[in-house]
Amino acid sequence: AIIQKRLLAHFGQGQVHHEPALLELIHAVPDWMALPELSTPQIKHSLEQAILAGTAPARLNTLKALIFNDLAFNFYNQVENAKIALSSQGATVLSLTERGLDLWELYTRLQFEQDIQAHARQIEQVVLDTVAASGLEPAQIDAVVKTGGSSSIPAFSEMLGRLFDPRKVIASNPFSSVTAGLAIRARQGASI
């Protein structure tokens, strides 16, 4: 959500119009698996031609740097670090200045929560559907164990506290508990 809602403008969204090939490149930025595949001579030539033609040159140079200067991993790490920071503080700065990429964005927890609102509603519905499928009422649930990186996001903790007795919502290590659960299931011989 951070990339789509806040960072695509740095790569030309909103300034590049009526050029489907360029728009496709810009919209590929959130897909970390697709980005390295874009570093072809044809795409480089397309970007350079658009830059020479004056199509959002600063923004497309930033996109070119991201794709061709092997900066995707650093970029996605900055985004992930911002999400982690917003779990414990009200704002953070996404900053990446290297090899032709000059990106700086102040990002607040409020913006983040607005950006993930649709996802939060979907997750809440999945939780409610899961409880309903269990045949239990929320008050009958003994413990709700928060797991995974997103479980540290305050909006999700608040949602769980609304749905269940907050005393029953248990924090776990968000990064190792999923792995531990899989190991337990594997040891029990269950198919995953």
Question: Residues of each region from the PLM?
Answer:
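Generic beta-strand/beta-sheet core signal
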Residues: 97, 144-149, 172, 183
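Conserved phosphate-binding/catalytic loops in two-lobed NTP-binding clefts
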Residues: 139, 157-184, 191-192
